[in-house]
């Protein structure tokens, strides 16, 4: 199926690109999330009419993500979890926990934007996580996990 991309999609293309993708990928992901439309003649004409507005919106999203990235870069998030004497946590620190702490600190971050490269954090100490604010903007945040031995 051919689709017109309405937003930048990683490993696929940018705004306005007409790409051929598998039918299921288009029907189940790209079209429902608003990232693409079917590439019909009427959709192409409608897209060209709205192209300037869509490019402006994309530039605004990128600028907002870059601004948040500058504030967020190098931030240290402190979390306290129950832990054993050997430093292992009872449970783990997930992307949802980190996103919740960042939101409490005043940064609008969704849990889907927090990338834990090595999986959930299961030990006491510092870990570096990546926060992907936009397809072009990602920053590193340090997470300090402290053990609560009570």
Swiss-Prot record:
One of its GO terms (biological process) is translation. GO terms for cellular component: ribonucleoprotein complex; ribosome. One of its GO terms (molecular function) is rRNA binding. Keywords: Ribonucleoprotein, Ribosomal protein, RNA-binding, rRNA-binding. The keyword Ribosomal protein applies. It comes from the Bacteria. Coiled coil: none annotated. SUPFAM superfamilies: L9 N-domain-like, Ribosomal protein L9 C-domain. The keyword Ribonucleoprotein applies. Binds to the 23S rRNA. Belongs to the bacterial ribosomal protein bL9 family. This is Large ribosomal subunit protein bL9. It comes from Delftia acidovorans (strain DSM 14801 / SPH-1).
């Amino acid at each position: 199926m051919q689709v017109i991309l309405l937003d930048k999609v990683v490993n696929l293309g940018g705004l306005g690109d007409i790409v051929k993708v598998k039918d299921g990928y288009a029907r189940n992901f790209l079209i429902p999330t608003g990232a693409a439309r079917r590439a019909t003649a009427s959709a192409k004409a409608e897209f060209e009419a709205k192209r300037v507005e869509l490019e402006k919106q994309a530039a605004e999203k990128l600028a907002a993500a870059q601004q948040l990235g500058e504030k967020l870069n190098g931030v240290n998030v402190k979390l306290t979890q129950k832990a054993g004497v050997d430093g292992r946590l009872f449970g783990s620190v997930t992307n949802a926990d980190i996103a919740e702490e960042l939101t409490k600190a005043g940064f609008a971050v969704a849990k889907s934007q927090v990338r834990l490269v090595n999986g959930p954090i299961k030990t006491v100490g510092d870990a570096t996580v990546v926060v992907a604010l936009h397809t072009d903007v990602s920053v590193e945040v340090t997470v300090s996990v402290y053990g609560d031995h009570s």
